A protein has these predicted regions:
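N-terminal [4Fe-4S]-dependent radical SAM core
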Residues: 1-22, 31, 35-42, 166-174, ...
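Conserved Radical SAM active-site core
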Residues: 2-3, 17, 32-118, 122-123
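Residues at the C-termini of beta-strands that transition into short coil/loop
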Residues: 7, 103, 134, 158
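Glycine-centered loop/turn positions within well-structured domains
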Residues: 28
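Short glycine-rich, flexible loops that bind phosphorylated cofactors or substrates
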Residues: 76, 138-139
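P-loop/Walker A phosphate-binding loop and immediately adjacent motor/lid segment at beta-alpha junctions
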Residues: 83-91, 140-181
Length: 181
């Protein structure tokens, strides 16, 4: 698996201050994608041990809230395989840090569609928040937090796993599905 970029101290792609990994490779190719340069599976650099260790070290400070994974497309089968053991390591080392994952696929497509692989369920088990659905230019809304178009959902994966149905995440402190640190 390759990656196009690693951003440290990112505040745009999930709650709080985060490290963000942009994987390479996307077959969906949404019109008006903000990250076209990551469509090729060979874009960027190899996601090797040096890159993994740099990300793990970047998650150490208390002010870093977690890791966000974007693309390209993290849920391409090749990328699922490349990410599953790494996200397992992140969760084991930093259980208090959240993992956000952005995908152009819907949760339903991932759990019962052609993108489901032998790695999918395990990969999803390490993800705290899944932002799903393709970016749709006609539904673009710059007032939305953490997503680009209104068709995209922010899914609370722990609540979804517990109930067996999609539970949306909310950052409203009164009706939140998550606890604040």
């Amino acid at each position: 698996m390759n990656y196009s970029t690693i951003k440290y101290c990112d505040i745009a792609n999930g709650e709080g201050v985060r490290t963000t990994l942009f994987v390479s490779g996307c077959r969906r190719r949404c019109p008006f994608c903000f990250n076209e340069e990551a469509w090729s599976f060979t874009a960027g650099r190899l996601f090797d041990d040096e890159a993994r260790q740099a990300i793990l070290a970047s998650l150490e400070p208390a002010y870093i809230d977690g890791l966000s994974v974007l693309g390209g497309e993290p849920m391409e089968p090749e990328n699922q395989h490349g990410l599953v053991s790494f996200l397992e390591t992140v969760k084991a080392r930093y259980p208090e840090k959240s993992i956000w994952c952005y995908t152009g696929d819907t949760y339903e497509e991932l759990t019962s569609g052609p993108k489901r692989t032998e790695d999918t369920d395990r990969l999803l088990s390490f993800i705290d928040i899944l932002v799903d659905g393709p970016f749709v230019q006609d539904l673009k809304d710059i007032t939305l937090r953490f997503r680009g178009s209104s068709n995209q959902r922010i899914i609370d994966m722990a609540a979804t796993r517990a109930t067996g149905k999609v539970v949306l995440w909310t950052d409203d402190p009164v009706f939140s599905t998550h606890t604040m640190n």
